[in-house]
Design a protein with these regions (language model features):
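N-terminal nucleotide-binding beta1-loop-alpha1 segment
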Residues: 1-18
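Conserved N-terminal catalytic core of the sugar/cofactor nucleotidyltransferase
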Residues: 31-114
């Protein structure tokens, strides 16, 4: 089975302090993103596209990786879906695409395998986690059949939706052929004029693609927004 990983690593991460890219913050003596690269390299027949932007050369020179990992420069950071679009030409037709984040390096191989298994069934598969204080996170809104109906951002959530503790990690898996088909429908009709990957959920549902969620431990995907985290 072919797996095409897409790692989003273009941001600066101003709250990290300093001038280095966020994904190069130190974790156990190595750049954060290196831990993630080591994980994806354990998958046979996997290829990885790392989407870089801010100080892209520094990111590339700071990591150790095989020829199965390539770097793609996102010249303008126009949102997560725009970043994923940069990798579309590199995707194989018979593969599963897995979107990861360079600042969430602790996701486990076993967790990714569960996500990929779900995607192979034709689902858009999201990785979610339970957050006791979910302030600021997108809430997972499930249907009566327990499928994911939509993701509601905190600022848009109703009082009852804000009580939901299952939140979106951003990590997802989907057949590459489906990703190519659905992602052009994502528009930037929002205040920031950005293309949000979370819109893929609504688009998938409209196209009769089941959206499933796999819940993982929060430590795997909580991400890092400052050096303490």
């Amino acid at each position: 089975m072919n797996i095409d990983f897409i790692i989003l690593a273009a941001g600066k991460g101003t709250r990290m302090g300093g001038d280095s890219p966020k994904v190069l913050a130190d974790l156990a003596g190595r750049p954060m993103i290196q831990h993630l690269l080591d994980t994806v390299e354990t998958f046979p027949k996997a290829k990885t596209s790392v989407i870089v932007g801010y100080k892209s050369k520094e990111v590339q020179e700071s990591v150790i990786c095989s020829k199965n990992i390539s770097f793609i420069n996102q010249k303008n950071q126009l949102g997560t879906a725009h970043a994923v679009k940069q990798a579309l030409p590199a995707l194989r037709n018979n593969s599963v695409s897995v979107v990861l984040y360079g600042d969430a390096p602790l996701v486990q191989k076993s967790t990714l395998n569960k996500l990929i298994k779900s995607a192979l069934k034709g689902n858009l598969s999201l990785l979610t986690f339970i957050k006791e204080d979910p302030t600021g996170y997108g809430r997972i809104i499930r249907s009566s059949k327990n499928a994911v109906h939509k993701i509601t951002e905190h600022k848009d959530a109703s009082t009852s939706e804000k009580e939901i503790k299952e939140v979106n990690s951003g990590i997802l898996a989907i057949k590459s052929s489906l990703l190519r088909e659905l992602i052009p429908s994502i528009k930037n009709n929002n205040a920031a004029k950005e293309y949000y990957l979370t819109d893929l959920v609504e688009i998938a549902n409209k196209n009769s693609v089941s959206v499933k969620a796999t819940i993982c431990d929060s430590y795997e995907v909580g991400g890092a927004n400052d050096r303490q985290e």
